[in-house]
């Protein structure tokens, strides 16, 4: 659930939640997260994993690709910054 988005669309914050599952992700944005409840695993494209539990705080950088694995229903606070992409014009 999104709580705020800036008028230019570059900044947003809210609460995300998901039931158990596993899916591929690719981030064009920088995302700060704090896990409010649950357990998930973030897998990067090189096969590294990070176990995420209640109270964990972390940043997913723009350009990250990998997958989210939700092991137990997970809720997180997110803060997203979407950088402006230079079109070269």
Predicted regions and their residues:
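Short, conserved beta-strand element in jelly-roll/cupin
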Residues: 18, 27-42
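Ligand-binding loop in jelly-roll beta-barrel domains
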Residues: 62-85
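A short, N-terminal "cap"/entry segment at the start of jelly-roll beta-barrel domains
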Residues: 1-10
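Conserved short histidine dyad/triad with adjacent acidic residue
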Residues: 9-27, 61-62
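Amphipathic, hydrophobic secondary-structure cores in small proteins
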Residues: 23-25, 38, 46, 52
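Short acidic-glycine-tyrosine-enriched beta hairpin
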Residues: 46-62
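A generic structural motif
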Residues: 43-45, 69
């Amino acid at each position: 659930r999104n709580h705020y988005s800036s008028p230019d669309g570059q900044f947003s914050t809210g609460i995300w939640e998901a039931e158990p599952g596993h899916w591929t992700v690719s981030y064009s944005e920088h995302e700060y997260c704090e896990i409010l409840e649950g357990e998930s695993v973030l897998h990067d494209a090189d096969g590294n994993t990070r176990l995420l539990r209640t109270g964990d705080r972390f940043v997913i950088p723009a350009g990250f690709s990998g997958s989210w694995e939700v092991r137990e229903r997970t809720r997180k606070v997110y803060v997203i910054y979407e950088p402006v992409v230079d079109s070269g014009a």
